[in-house]
Amino acid sequence: MAGRRAGLIVQICVLAMGLALGLAPPARAETSSPFDAWAVVVVAGDWRGAGGGPTKAFDNARRDIAARLSDRGFDADRIRQFSVKPESALARQATAKAIYETLSAESAQAPGCMVYVTSHGDPQGVVVGDLILPPNILGLMIDRSCGAKPTVVVVSACFSGVFVPALAKPNRMILTAARPDRTSFGCGEADTYPYFDDCFLQVLKDAAHFAVLARGVQACVAAREIREGVSLPSEPQIWIGPQLRPLLPLLTFAAPASP
C-alpha cells in the first residue's frame, strides 16, 4: 500500500510538472539582423536652405533616417549621427575629420558599413559645414575604414551622381539623389525633408533589402517630382558592385515594428 501511494505521488508530481511546462510561455527564439553589427554614419551636412535661410530639412532627415534604420535591424548604439548644428547628444559636430575618425573606429570590428550624407551639393562634391567634401576624399575615407567589407553609401544632394565613379567598388552599393548634372529638390527653408530623403524614409519602412529600397526610392522620387511639376527631373542613380549584388537579397532588413 505504501509503495502504491508513493508511486501515485510520483505520477502526480510528474503530471504537475508536465502541466506547468505546458502552460509556460514558449521560449522566444533569439533573432538577429544581418545589419545589427554594421557601422553606420548618418550626416546632415548643412543647416541652410536653398534660399540661404535656416532649414531643418537635413537634420530632420538625419534624425529620422537613423531611427528608421534602427527599426529595420541596425543597432541604434552603432549608428553615429553628425550635424553642423547638433542640438542633442545624439549628434556630433560634422567635420570630415570627425566623420572619418568615427567611421574608422566603428568599422574596425564591424562586418559591414553604411554611410548616409544629406546636404547641399555642387559638381565638386557635397557640403559639410562651410567646406565641400569631394568624391575622391570621401572615397579615401571609406577605403581606409571599411575597406573590402560590404558597404552601402547614400548621398542625398544636388549633383550627387558625381560620387559614383569615385566610390564604385565591387563590394559597394551607391545610391545618389541625382545625376551628376542634375539638381535634387526639397531643401528649402520650409521643407520637412528633401524629396529624396522623404522617399528613402517611406520606402525603407517596408522594403525587403537594399536593392528593392533603391529601386523604390527612384520610383518614389520620380512620382513626387511629377506631382510637383519639376521640369528637369533629378534621376537618382544606383550602382551595385558585382561582389555585393548577389548578396543583397540575402541581407534582409528586420521586420518593421508594428504601428
Set out the residue ranges of the language-model regions.
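N-terminal secretory signal peptides that target proteins for export/translocation
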Residues: 1-6
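Bacterial N-terminal signal peptides
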Residues: 9-22
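Boundary/activation segment at the start of structured domains
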Residues: 22, 26-111, 186-194, 240, ...
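Structural recognition of the beta-strand scaffold that forms the well-ordered cores
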Residues: 39-44, 78-83, 113-118, 151-156, ...
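Stable alpha-helical elements in mature extracytoplasmic
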Residues: 54, 58-65, 95-102, 134-141, ...
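A short, glycine/acidic-enriched catalytic loop
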Residues: 108, 117-147
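Active-site-proximal C-terminal subdomain of hydrolase catalytic domains
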Residues: 152-241
